[in-house]
C-alpha cells in the first residue's frame, strides 16, 4: 500500500481469499504486524528498517560535531525537516530517529520548519527554497526522508548560493 494505514484492510481481504501476502518497502505499523503473528497469518514485510535509516542519517550529521554544525553560535543544531508522506510509517520513523540521533549524541536541536515533500524532488526543492528565504543562515541542517527530496534540497541550497557542509 502507498499508505501504511491501509495495511489492515488489504491484509484482511487477502487473508479472506487465502493468499499469502508480502509487503515490500512499506512497513505496516507494529500493531498490524503483531496482529499477523497473533492470528498466525501468512503475511510478512520485506524492506529496510526505517528506524535504523533515520538513526544513520542523524549519526552521520552528529559526527561533524556541534562546533561545525552550530554556525550561528546559539548552541543548538537548527534544522528543517522535509518529510515524505505523513501517513507512511517509514517517513515517521526516519523523521523521529534522525533527530533523536543528534539528541543522543548530546546535541540540543531546534526545529525551524517541517514540511511534507511527498517523496518528490521538485516539491522538496521548492519547500527548501522557501525555508531558506524565510530562515536564511539560521538553517544549519536540512533533513529529508529520501534521496529524491535530498537532491531537491541540494538544488535549492545551491541556488541560494550556499555550499553544503560549509555554510
Predicted features by range, described:
Residues 1-167:
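A residue-level marker of the well-folded mature domains of exported/periplasmic proteins
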Amino acid at each position: 500500500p502507498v499508505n501504511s494505514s491501509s495495511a489492515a484492510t488489504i491484509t484482511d481481504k487477502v487473508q479472506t481469499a487465502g493468499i499469502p501476502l508480502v509487503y515490500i518497502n512499506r512497513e505496516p505499523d507494529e500493531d498490524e504486524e503483531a496482529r499477523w503473528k497473533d492470528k498466525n497469518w501468512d503475511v510478512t514485510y520485506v524492506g529496510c528498517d526505517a528506524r535504523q535509516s533515520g538513526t544513520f542519517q542523524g549519526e552521520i550529521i552528529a559526527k561533524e560535531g556541534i562546533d561545525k554544525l552550530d554556525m550561528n553560535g546559539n548552541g543548538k543544531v537548527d534544522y528543517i525537516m522535509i518529510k515524505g508522506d505523513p501517513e507512511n510509517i517509514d517517513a515517521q520513523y526516519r523523521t523521529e530517529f534522525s533527530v533523536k540521533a543528534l539528541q543522543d549524541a548530546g546535541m540540543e536541536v531546534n526545529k525551524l520548519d517541517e514540511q511534507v515533500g511527498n517523496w518528490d524532488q521538485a516539491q522538496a526543492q521548492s519547500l527548501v527554497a522557501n525555508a531558506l528565504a524565510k530562515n536564511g543562515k539560521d538553517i544549519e541542517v536540512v533533513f529529508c526522508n529520501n534521496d529524491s527530496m535530498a537532491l531537491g534540497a541540494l538544488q535549492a541550497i545551491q541556488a541560494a548560493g550556499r555550499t553544503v557542509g560549509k555554510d
